[in-house]
């Protein structure tokens, strides 16, 4: 009789039990984001008192970094019918350690001589050739919604806006610049918006003047477009049309090619009225080598489209893209609903060692409604070009109630997009945090973290390799369909089909 407790049979049984328990622990650990130890820093506040805003609110941030400077821009004092009393900025000139905030002058009637009632959709970039920061905006007035750009030499002092387009029917603007010194088009800046036809104007003088708006060769319709510039000067514009789509220019924006599909898109919208939960706008980034990354929310990996994951697709040439891969923030059987991602890519890294960070909003329980849904802010990071990711972490912004958020035409609002940026190798996200209203005012503002968003060297990384999109999965209902500044999804005019 063999009494050895480590006999082959007994040892194998123990190994099986250990493996089972280990798998259980990993799945349990990934079931919901872990509370991270971060100190939140409020970087701006709503100081306006105009009668038509919902005060003590800030929504919808974008960020960009260059050198030791990082600039965030966002709406301040949200107006229910669209935009904010003005656009605000928050700037750090010491790699995210301290922040200075203010408002863009001359943009609205609420600050330093503007003529517009509101402004929306901030997008920020730096033009390295001309040494100027640019914030793109949508000025809103009785005559419609236009596109403008504000300039600054230091990210702290801003000039009055320069009008880019005054057609009056614009939405979802985005701006980028060619900061590749060896590119033939170094210094070109590209301003995008939709009508909902995707339009792009080019500046060759640091945003002082802008050329006539142009479209893709096939007149693509969509929204949420984000242009990026590769080292050779090729501009790649990703956008949400009927699916995730893109088109390119290889001649500095003189002409644009026809649009093509990156991937089909399906999203879970659920039962809450929170704006943009089921809206898969792309969030994009580019590494040092010119590799492109696009992230969006998608339910295609979940049976019956039960909840949204974040998914990622990449391209080295702008025209051929990888099949979407699920970012393994948590396990496939989790109940977490992930939405509104903000991707940051460290432009000093590349390829298999590229550093990526994604911030996002999430519901711990996807099957919730306005009375039970609680919004959290999370993040995940990768140091191998998106091959593996850390488990999702809750940044500790609290469990935000839907009733704490300002109204928009399409529901209570945090954002249509988020943003993260790397400054000197350290990732920071800017996001909106809402607390319980007080004294008849909201309590929502722009925040970041004191510590950079990073993981320890020994923190587990997870891969979704081998996971497949489930055939036949479809969105629980069509994307939200609205018009004007508040249009959350692409909409073609009568008789015109969205381009595929």
Which residues fall in each region the model found?
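C-terminal PAP-associated
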Residues: 36-500
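Bacterial N-terminal signal peptides
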Residues: 18-29
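Residue-level detector of alpha-helical hydrophobic segments embedded in or interacting with membranes
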Residues: 3, 27-28, 56
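Sec/Tat signal peptide C-region and signal peptidase I cleavage site
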Residues: 30-36
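Hydrophobic alpha-helical segments, principally membrane-spanning helices and signal/leader peptides
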Residues: 12, 16-18, 79, 302
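Leucine-biased recognition of intrinsically disordered, low-complexity hydrophobic segments
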Residues: 6, 21-22, 498
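N-terminal secretory signal peptides that target proteins for export/translocation
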Residues: 1-14
């Amino acid at each position: 009789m063999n009494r050895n407790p480590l006999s082959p049979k007994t040892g194998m049984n123990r190994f099986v039990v250990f493996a089972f328990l280990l798998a259980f622990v990993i799945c349990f650990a990934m079931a919901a984001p872990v509370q991270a130890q971060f100190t939140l820093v409020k970087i701006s506040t709503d100081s306006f008192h105009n009668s038509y805003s919902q005060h003590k609110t800030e929504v919808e941030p974008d960020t960009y970094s260059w050198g030791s400077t990082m600039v965030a821009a966002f709406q301040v004092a949200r107006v229910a019918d669209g935009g904010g009393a003005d656009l605000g900025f928050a700037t750090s000139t010491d790699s995210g350690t301290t922040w200075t905030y203010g408002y863009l002058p001359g943009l609205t009637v609420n600050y330093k001589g503007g003529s517009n009632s509101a402004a929306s959709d901030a997008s920020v970039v730096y033009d390295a050739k001309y040494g100027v920061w640019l914030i793109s905006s949508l000025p809103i007035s009785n005559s419609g919604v236009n596109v403008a750009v504000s300039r600054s030499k230091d990210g702290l002092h801003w000039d009055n806006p320069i009008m880019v387009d005054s057609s009056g029917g614009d939405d979802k603007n985005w701006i980028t610049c060619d900061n590749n010194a060896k590119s033939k088009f170094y210094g070109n800046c590209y301003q995008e918006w939709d009508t909902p036809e995707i339009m792009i104007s080019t500046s060759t003088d640091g945003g002082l003047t802008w050329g006539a708006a142009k479209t893709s060769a096939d007149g693509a319709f969509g929204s949420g477009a984000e242009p990026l510039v590769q080292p050779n000067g090729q501009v790649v514009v990703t956008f949400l049309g009927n699916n995730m789509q893109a088109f390119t220019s290889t001649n500095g924006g003189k002409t644009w090619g026809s649009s093509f599909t990156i991937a089909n898109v399906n999203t879970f919208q659920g039962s809450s009225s929170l704006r943009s939960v089921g809206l898969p706008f792309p969030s994009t980034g580019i590494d040092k080598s010119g590799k492109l990354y696009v992230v969006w929310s998608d339910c295609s990996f979940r049976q019956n489209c039960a909840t949204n994951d974040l998914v990622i697709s990449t391209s080295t040439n702008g025209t051929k893209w990888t099949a979407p891969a699920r970012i393994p923030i948590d396990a496939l059987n989790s109940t977490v609903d992930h939405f509104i991602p903000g991707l940051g890519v460290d432009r000093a890294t590349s390829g298999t060692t590229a550093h990526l960070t994604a911030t996002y909003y999430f519901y711990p329980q996807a099957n919730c409604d306005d009375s039970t849904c609680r919004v959290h802010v999370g993040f995940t990071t990768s140091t191998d070009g998106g091959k593996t990711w850390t488990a999702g972490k809750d940044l500790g912004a609290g469990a935000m109630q839907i009733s704490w958020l300002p109204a928009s035409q399409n529901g209570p609002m945090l954002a249509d997009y988020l943003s993260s940026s790397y400054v000197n190798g350290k990732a920071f996200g800017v996001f909106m945090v809402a607390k319980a209203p007080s004294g008849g005012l909201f309590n929502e503002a722009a925040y970041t973290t004191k510590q950079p968003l990073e993981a320890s060297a020994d923190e587990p990384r997870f891969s979704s390799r081998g996971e497949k999109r489930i055939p036949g999965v479809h969105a629980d209902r069509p994307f939200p369909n609205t018009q004007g500044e508040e249009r959350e999804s692409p909409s073609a005019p009568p008789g015109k089909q969205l381009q595929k």
